[in-house]
Amino acid sequence: MNTTATLHPITKLKSQIEANLQWGESSVWNNYDFEKLSEQIVEKTSVSLSVSTLKRIFGKVSYKSEPSMTTLNALSQFLDYEDWRDFLVKNPVNTETPLP
């Protein structure tokens, strides 16, 4: 039986955004929350991410493609990383995380 799981880097990014905002888990966010997040991202990074894009990232809307590099860079910069690459370097994926 496999008792390890890989925590996807985008999952880490989302968790850090949730912790930074202190609005609770994104699974309970509503449209207003995504609008406020979009506004905060523009204010901090000068990059406009639509509410629809944010909902896709946070799993509120079904979408099979990976986010664009522009989106990942903006979300990383929102958390005070230089860009997505800097986020990845400073948040290595732990492939040996035990499952509960």
Could you tell me what each predicted segment is?
Residues M69-W84:
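DNA major-groove recognition helix of helix-turn-helix/homeodomain DNA-binding modules
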Residues N20-W29, Q40-P67:
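Recognition helix of helix-turn-helix/homeodomain-like DNA-binding domains
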Residues M1-S38:
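A short, Lys/Arg-rich alpha-helix, primarily the initiator
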Residues D33-E35, S68-T71:
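DNA-recognition element of transcription regulators
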Residues K55, G59, L72, V93-N94:
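Residue-level signal for alpha-helical context at structural boundaries
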Residues M1-N2, D80-P100:
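Defense-system signaling and execution modules centered on TIR/cGAS-STING-like, death/scaffold domains
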